[in-house]
């Protein structure tokens, strides 16, 4: 036990509330900002923060704070709409947050490459029923901002972007880092091209807003 205590540095302990605060801020902004595209983009931060975590404690802090803040308004709305006791809404909220945070915590692992692989499975689990039925803004909606109207390809590009950028920052393997940089550059170029095409289509009056599940448009409504 004494040996374990000696390995814990104050900076590591401070990083836990800091990562939790980062998760809470990203959740708050993703709900409170008026512009839909800003909300979609900010939901991109949760998986990135999780991939950047260096311990399971940080992973718990990020996930728990994000989902608690993002889901807080829903518990209040449920109280106002149904008339149920507010304590019931908070109890359900706490149970849901603990369940989802536990999933994100269990999925976290020290080795970076397995962490990136687990992340894709984790993303699928937390964005499908039953969890998705009560979920905060889906992280996959950020695909609509980064790669508008690219459909399934945009969704795949968005999922790839998270581990790709994390590998750039965290890996010491030169080959993996180089490959990640190349992929990141291609993704950025694709994102810019898709957004330019989207803006051109909007200005020309040819923008057709599709269902988010099929085309993932940049905005849920177009200008009339």
Where are these regions (language model features)?
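Membrane-embedded alpha-helical bundles of multi-pass enzymes
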Residues: 1-205, 209, 214-219
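A short aromatic-anchored loop/beta-hairpin motif
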Residues: 223-224
């Amino acid at each position: 036990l004494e040996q374990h205590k000696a390995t814990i540095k104050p900076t590591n302990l401070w990083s836990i509330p800091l990562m939790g605060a980062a998760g809470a801020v990203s959740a708050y902004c993703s709900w409170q900002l008026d512009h839909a595209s800003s909300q979609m983009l900010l939901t991109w931060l949760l998986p990135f923060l999780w991939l950047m975590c260096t311990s399971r404690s940080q992973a718990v802090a990020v996930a728990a704070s994000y989902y608690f803040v993002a889901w807080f308004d829903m518990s209040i709305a449920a109280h106002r709409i149904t008339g149920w006791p507010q304590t019931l809404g908070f109890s359900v909220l706490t149970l849901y947050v603990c369940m989802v945070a536990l999933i994100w915590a269990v999925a976290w692992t020290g080795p970076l490459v397995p962490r990136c692989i687990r992340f894709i499975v984790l993303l699928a689990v937390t964005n499908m029923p039953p969890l998705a039925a009560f979920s905060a803004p889906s992280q996959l909606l950020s695909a609509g901002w980064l790669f508008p109207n690219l459909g399934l390809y945009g969704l795949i590009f968005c999922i790839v972007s998270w581990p790709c950028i994390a590998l750039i920052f965290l890996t010491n393997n030169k080959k993996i880092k180089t490959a990640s940089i190349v992929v990141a550059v291609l993704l950025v170029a694709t994102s810019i091209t898709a957004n330019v095409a989207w803006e051109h289509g909007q200005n020309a009056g040819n923008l057709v807003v599709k269902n988010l599940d099929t085309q993932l448009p940049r905005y849920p409504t177009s200008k009339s």
